[in-house]
């Protein structure tokens, strides 16, 4: 899955840098990827964080804020026994123990709005 994700990001970067049309991008992507595949693909809503604040828009928005290719992979954290999602409190502990930042969606949205207010945000 890591190789698939890396190649998808590389190809997405190329598509964006070459400013390909939607048809050209679909052709380029379709030459290497098929659906269904072993990694579910989610697309952010048109307008990104301006029009939607779901997990996909938040993840892609975070990549954009970091000036990374807006291609991300999501994974659900599970309880140690594998029976259900990890609670937010336990996810915070897990992140803290590993010195990994833990962000709430509201923090990503606030950073997005702050950056969009900067004069050079459209550049």
Language model features with spans:
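Catalytic domains of riboflavin
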Residues: 1-123
């Amino acid at each position: 899955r890591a190789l698939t994700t890396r190649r998808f990001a590389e190809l997405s970067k190329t598509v964006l840098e070459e400013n390909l049309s939607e048809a050209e991008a679909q052709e380029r992507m379709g030459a290497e990827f098929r659906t269904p595949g072993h990694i579910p693909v989610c697309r952010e809503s048109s307008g990104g964080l301006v029009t939607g604040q779901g997990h996909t828009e938040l993840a892609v928005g975070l990549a954009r804020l970091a000036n990374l290719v807006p291609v991300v992979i999501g994974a659900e954290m599970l309880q140690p026994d594998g029976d259900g999602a990890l609670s937010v409190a336990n996810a915070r502990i897990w992140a803290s123990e590993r010195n990994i930042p833990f962000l709430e969606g509201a923090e990503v949205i606030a950073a997005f709005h702050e950056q969009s207010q900067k004069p050079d945000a459209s550049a």
